[in-house]
Amino acid sequence: MSSKNKDKNINNSSINAQSTINANSSQKSPTKLKLNDSIKDKTGIIEVYKENFFEELYNLSELLEDYNYIGMDTEFPGTVFSIKNMCDDFYYKSLKTNVDNLKLIQLGITITNEKGEYPKNYPYHTWQFNLEFDKNVDKYHPSSLNLLTQSGIDFDKLKNRGINHQTFAEYLMTSNLVLNPDIKWISFQGSYDFGYLLKLLLGTELPEKEDKFVYWLNKFF
C-alpha cells in the first residue's frame, strides 16, 4: 500500500473512531474521575481493561496539553522467532518477524510535564492498558510468559477482560497521543515497544524496509 493511501486510511480511521469516542464521553462527566477501587492502585497506577477503556483514554487525553512528556513501556510475549542468516538489516528483520507474528500484551504510559512533574490533583499518573491475550491460542515464549506472570500480569483477566487490539488502535488514533508533534515520547531501548504500537496503528505487518519503518515512526510519534 502506498504512503498516500495509507495516510488516507489513517484519516478515515481517526474520523470514525472520533465519532464513537465523543458519543461515549458525552454520556459521562470526564472531568470528574470515577474511580473503581478494584482497578485503582495507590501507587498512582490504574489498570485499564475493556470495561474502563473509553473513560480512561479520555481522561488521559484531557491531561496531555499540560503533561505532554510520555514515558512508555510495553509487555509482549518474548522473542519467539529467530533469524538464522546474518545480514545487514539482521536486527530489523528479527524485530519485524517477531512483531508481525506476536501480540502486544500491555502498554504502560506515564505522563509528566517538562519539569518531570506528575499531574496535580489527580489520583494517578500511569495507565496500564491490558490487551486481549489468550495463552491457549496466541504464540509466546514460555520463559517470558512465566516472568510476566511472576510480575503480576493475570492472563485469565487478559483473556476475558483484555482490550480488543483493533479497538485499541482505532481510539488511540483520536487520543492526541499519536500524530501530535507536541507529544514527547520517551522509551528505553524502545524499538520493540514502538514496533508493536506501529503494527497496531497501521493495521498491518511492519514495512519490509527499515527506512520505511523509520518513516512511519516519525509520522506517528
Task: Label the predicted regions.
Residues M1-D41:
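Long, polar low-complexity intrinsically disordered regions
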Residues K4, L102-F221:
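Metal-dependent phosphoesterase core characteristic of DEDDh/y 3'-5' exonuclease domains
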Residues K32-K34, I39-L104, G108-T110:
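Entry/capping segment at the start of metal-dependent catalytic domains
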